[in-house]
């Protein structure tokens, strides 16, 4: 679906009406859930959300439907989170950093250079640590159905290639609102500038920020290459993406419906992460085709030396070092 200006205004108006209404409930107990996310329609989140809708409909015998609204159509990240908490939106997914003010222990997942590889990520997200972190949402009005991913984060900018920490000094870099991300770029001498993902392209285009940090899939799908010349594969952090629903609405479902939704969301997490792995490879090739200059082997050891220990120590001071030790032990 491509939205021109007129259709976007019409769709946005419809979205406003949807947010003002409760879940669509039929006479025979049928329910249509609404799900929003900020990523483009070409992203693995959208593909997986559509798969979830098909699976829920099939396995429930048509009792559960899922309407999916991509591109931040129902609001930016904080708006959609608050809409789910209020019960105006049923499900949403976005990057872990946008939840850390509600569920502070989730900050651990965003610590720089915490994860060694994808096997390490899977052992953490799909194991006891992931289960523990999902319970951190208790009392927030949200229930974490599963942990999807955004992926490995890399730096882009419009000024110069970034090969060493010195190259990033002075650059105004859009970050998420996560304290670990902000502190890491501050330590590197950059100017971290948190903002919603839906506002980022315009900020890059207008020069309000020099650069940003995201996975290659999002850099491609969001067309950031139109405003950014240089990509450095810093792989400085991995971003999980909690898929959340309204806790009270989930509790109100019958046992079979609730179990099916959770099972489908968690199977969707495994599918989405596998799909993202494939697209990370193809997206990098396409970014080169679009003219981006890629620094494949920046001095990650030097970046790690500056940010890893102090940011992890800061987390440990606030929340204790137990979680970090458990994650390190899962490597």
At which residue positions do the language-model features occur?
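N-terminal secretory/targeting leader peptides
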Residues: 2-3, 7-22, 26-120, 128-129, ...
